[in-house]
C-alpha cells in the first residue's frame, strides 16, 4: 500500500496547530521536523551540530492513505491554513505532496519517546517499564494523537510550575488538557478536585485513557476554554498558544478563587510582552516569568 505524504513548511509556533489540522482532515500520522529538538536536555547524549545545518523553519509531515481524494485534501488544507493564518504566524505555508511506501506511522515515533524527568516528576511512556521510587512522581503516558508528551519546552515549564505552586487540597482546572499530562500531574501532587477541558474530542478521549492508566480521578470534558464554567479554582493552567492565552486573560478571573493563580505557557518569546500586557490590562498581577529556549511561562495572580 502507498501513502500520500503531505509536507507543510511552517514555523515552530504553528507546529501544533498545523498538526491538529492534518489530524482533523484524516491523517494517519504526523511527524515534525524542527531544529528545536536538538535543544532538549534529555533527548541526546551528544550532538555534532555541524551535522545539523540551522534552519529558520519547521516541516510538518502527515500521511494519508492512497484512497484519499488528493485534490480535495489539498484544497481543504489550504483553506484551513488560510483560516489559521488569521490568528497565528504559519510561516511560508508551502505544501508539497509525494507518494511513499507503507509504514506503521502510528507507532514509529514510539522508538524515540523515552522516560523524561522534570524535577521530581518522571514521564514514562505506557509501553516502557520504570522502577517505582518514593522520591519521584511517576506519570504513565500514551499521548496518542493529543499534544503533551512532556518533552516540549512549554510542557516542561508547566510541569516545573505545578510542582512549585500546587499544594495538597487545591482545586485545579487544566484548560486545553491535550494528553491530560498536566491534570494528572496536579492530581498526583495532591490536588483535591481537578477539572480538565479541551475543545477537541480526540484529546478528551486520550486524556481519559491516560487518567485511567494512572489510576487518578479527574473530571475530563469537552469544552471551549472556560465558557460556561461556574466553579472557582485555586489554580488554572493553560499550555496553549499566546493568542488563546490573551483571549483567556479577560475571563480567567471568573474561574479563579481570590488570589488564585493562572499558570500559562506555550508562549513563543516574541509574544511574551503581548501576554504580559493583556494580564496587566485585565488586572492580573504577574508573579513569575520563566523561559526555556525561546518558549515562555507566565504565572499571574488574581
UniProtKB/Swiss-Prot annotation:
Q: Which Gene3D superfamilies does the annotation name?
A: Vaccinia Virus protein VP39
A GO BP term here is: methylation
Chief place where the protein resides: cytoplasm
Residues reported to bind S-adenosyl-L-methionine: 155, 176, 198, 239
Q: Does the keyword Chloroplast apply?
A: no
Which reaction equations make up its catalytic activity?
Answer: L-lysyl-[protein] + 3 S-adenosyl-L-methionine = N(6),N(6),N(6)-trimethyl-L-lysyl-[protein] + 3 S-adenosyl-L-homocysteine + 3 H(+)
Which EC number(s) are documented for this chain?
A: 2.1.1.-
Q: Which UniProt keywords apply?
A: Cytoplasm, Methyltransferase, S-adenosyl-L-methionine, Transferase
Q: Which GO terms describe its molecular function?
A: protein-lysine N-methyltransferase activity
Compartment(s): Cytoplasm
* Family to which this protein belongs: Belongs to the methyltransferase superfamily. PrmA family.
Name the job this protein performs: Methylates ribosomal protein L11.
Record-linked HAMAP family: Methyltr_PrmA
Question: By what name is this protein known?
Answer: Ribosomal protein L11 methyltransferase
Q: Lineage from the top down?
A: Bacteria, Bacillati, Bacillota, Bacillota incertae sedis, Caldicellulosiruptorales
Amino acid at each position: 500500500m502507498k501513502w500520500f505524504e503531505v509536507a507543510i513548511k511552517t514555523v515552530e509556533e504553528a507546529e501544533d496547530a498545523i498538526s491538529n489540522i492534518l489530524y482533523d482532515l484524516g491523517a494517519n500520522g504526523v511527524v515534525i521536523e524542527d531544529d528545536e529538538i536538538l535543544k532538549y536536555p534529555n533527548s541526546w547524549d551528544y550532538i555534532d551540530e555541524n551535522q545539523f545545518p540551522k534552519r529558520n523553519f519547521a516541516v510538518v509531515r502527515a500521511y494519508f492513505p492512497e484512497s484519499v481524494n488528493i485534490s480535495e485534501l489539498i484544497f481543504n488544507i489550504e483553506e484551513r491554513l488560510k483560516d489559521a493564518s488569521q490568528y497565528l504566524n504559519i510561516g511560508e505555508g508551502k505544501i508539497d505532496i509525494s507518494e511513499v511506501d507503507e509504514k506503521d506511522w502510528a507507532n514509529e515515533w514510539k522508538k524515540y519517546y523515552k522516560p523524561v524527568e522534570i524535577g521530581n516528576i518522571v514521564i514514562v511512556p505506557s509501553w516502557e517499564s520504570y522502577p517505582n521510587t518514593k522520591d519521584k512522581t511517576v506519570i504513565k503516558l500514551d499521548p496518542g494523537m493529543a499534544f503533551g508528551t512532556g518533552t516540549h519546552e512549554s510542557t516542561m515549564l508547566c510541569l516545573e510550575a505545578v510542582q512549585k505552586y500546587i499544594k495538597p487540597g487545591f482545586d485545579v482546572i487544566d484548560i486545553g488538557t491535550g494528553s491530560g499530562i498536566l491534570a494528572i500531574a496536579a492530581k498526583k501532587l495532591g490536588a483535591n478536585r481537578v477539572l480538565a477541558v479541551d475543545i477537541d474530542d480526540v484529546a478528551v478521549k486520550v486524556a481519559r485513557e491516560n487518567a485511567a492508566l494512572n489510576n487518578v480521578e479527574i473530571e475530563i470534558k469537552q469544552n471551549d476554554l472556560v465558557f460556561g464554567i461556574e466553579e472557582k479554582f485555586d489554580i488554572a493552567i493553560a499550555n496553549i498558544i499566546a493568542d488563546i492565552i490573551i483571549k483567556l486573560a479577560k475571563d480567567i478571573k471568573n474561574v479563579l478563587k481570590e488570589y488564585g493563580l493562572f499558570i500559562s505557557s506555550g508562549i513563543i518569546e516574541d509574544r511574551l510582552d503581548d501576554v504580559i500586557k493583556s494580564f496587566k490590562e485585565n488586572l492580573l498581577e504577574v508573579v513569575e516569568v520563566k523561559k526555556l529556549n525561546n518558549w515562555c511561562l507566565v504565572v499571574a495572580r488574581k
